[in-house]
Regions:
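Active-site loop/lid in soluble adenylation, ligation, and acyl-transfer enzymes
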Residues: 64-227, 338-417
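N-terminal chloroplast transit peptides
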Residues: 1-45
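Catalytic activation segment of kinase domains across protein kinase-like and atypical kinase folds
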Residues: 281-326
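Beta-rich nucleic-acid/ligand-interaction surfaces
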Residues: 161-162, 274-292, 381-383
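A long amphipathic alpha-helix within ATP-dependent nucleotide-binding catalytic cores
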Residues: 245-276
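Short glycine/proline-rich, acidic loop/turn segments that cap or connect secondary-structure elements
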Residues: 7-10, 319-339
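Short Pro/Gly-enriched beta-strand edge/turn motifs at strand-loop
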Residues: 10, 17-18, 80-91, 259-264
Length: 417
């Protein structure tokens, strides 16, 4: 490490003067600098310029942008948000439930949903992907805002880049999957069941002669029951027979799901992408309003393909260019049995970083905005102490741990309710 010295206009890097042992929690470095008080503003200015260089990455198709993201992802591999414990750090949270990707906390009338970097498929966690939680959360926020003309949603606020605070509601135990293409590699994917000879799936009659990745004649609904272990395909008639929803609820949610998907297809195609399939979850608020919950049109809940190369690759029998987690699924299927093997191989680091890039590429492409990469260097500084009469200032230079940042932001948000 090094210390900063010089006048406000001529800051220089000097060898470190003092290094104290940091706590593992904050990973802080105490350094003595020769800065005078008047130099603080210069340090602040320098940090802002450095930060903007790192995070202001605009959407670009050139290799330089992809390289920047891959480098940033590689540097964050050991700092992913794989687990949270806000029930231990935020006052007022009543309990925690751990999903495959999200940690959900009960806050009375609201739920605090923390989107982690955990990557799930085949009903289990496969890896942790840098920036993934932030990408999913911010992608959903964008779509929640854009789809309010179709359906209300449970969003209340987003106090942190990984956090959504939502209205508490009774979630229907059904996931509404909408598809336009026959594809996939999981047990419940349309291509898997079709290849096994099934021609009536979730109440949909499928014609003979379809091939993988082919476009269907219309959008179709293929619901599944929600389960902690394994989702089970179910038809609309079975949903009613099992008492999972009333007919009115089923009709309303089905119409909303199809309308959301149609709108998502339109937005995706306008930006050079194909929304292949996706899943939605809905709940009922205390006043009876049916609302969209969880996430919407993220690369975790959806498949996206590059539009301009789809037809040529399909005609050649080549897998479409995808902008989702399908290529990671395929890697695991080629190297193990992800459903039955007790221990899975570790995903290659270059594959993990590539997935981080694809998720960010999707966010930037859909939203036409830049993705703010978290600063992986010194995030902020604090005045530690000033020895009287010494003319020196000691600074605490620190990268704020992700969990501390989330704790701070969630605590502030809940205190305002």
């Amino acid at each position: 490490m090094a210390a900063l010295t010089g006048s406000p206009s001529t800051l220089q890097i000097l060898p470190k003067k003092t290094l104290l042992v940091p706590s593992t929690r904050s990973r802080c470095l105490f350094m003595t600098s020769l800065l005078r008080p008047s130099s603080i503003s210069a340090l602040t200015s320098m940090q802002k310029k450095s930060s903007s260089k790192v995070v202001a990455l605009l959407l670009s198709e050139n290799d330089s942008h992809r390289g920047d993201v891959l480098h940033a992802a590689s540097s964050m591999l050991s700092n992913c948000l794989s687990e949270t414990h806000l029930d231990q750090t935020v006052r007022g949270l009543l309990s925690k439930s751990r999903g495959k990707v999200r940690d959900v906390y009960d806050a009375g009338d609201h739920l605090v949903l923390v989107t982690t970097d955990r990557q799930s498929a085949f009903d289990r966690v496969l890896a942790s992907i840098p920036f993934k939680g932030q990408v999913l959360n911010e992608t959903s926020l964008w779509w929640f805002n854009k789809t309010q003309h179709i359906t209300p949603n449970a969003l209340v606020s987003a106090p942190d880049r990984n956090v959504t605070i939502a209205k508490k509601c009774s979630v229907f135990p059904v996931e509404f999957v909408v598809r336009r293409y026959i594809t996939g590699s999981t047990d419940t994917s349309l291509w898997t069941v079709y290849a096994e000879g099934i021609r009536n799936y979730c109440g949909n009659s499928l014609p003979e002669g379809l091939v993988k990745n082919e476009k269907l004649s219309a959008n179709i609904l293929t619901p599944t029951t929600k389960s902690a272990d394994h989702d089970v395909p179910v038809s609309p008639d079975e949903i009613l027979q099992l008492g999972l929803m009333t007919k009115d609820e089923l009709d309303e949610v089905s119409n909303k799901a199809l309308a959301l998907f149609s709108y998502g297809q339109q937005v995706a195609l306008e930006n050079g992408l194909i929304l292949v399939d996706t899943k939605y979850e809905f709940g009922k608020a205390a006043d009876g309003t049916i609302m969209l919950v969880d996430e919407v049109h993220t690369p975790d809940s959806s498949r996206y393909w590059i539009a301009n190369s789809y037809q040529e690759r399909f005609n050649s029998g080549i897998e479409p260019e995808n902008v989702d987690k399908e290529f990671l699924r395929l890697w695991f299927k080629e190297h193990c049995n992800p459903y039955e093997d007790e221990v899975l191989p570790e995903a290659p680091k270059d594959l993990v970083c590539e997935l981080a890039w694809r998720y960010i590429f999707l966010f930037e492409t859909i939203t036409n905005s830049k993705f703010q990469l978290p600063v992986s260097e010194v995030a902020y500084y604090k005045l530690y102490f000033t020895p009287v009469g010494s003319g020196h200032i000691n600074f605490l230079l620190s990268q704020e741990p992700i969990h501390d940042r989330i704790t701070r932001n969630v605590s502030n948000a809940l205190s305002s309710f």
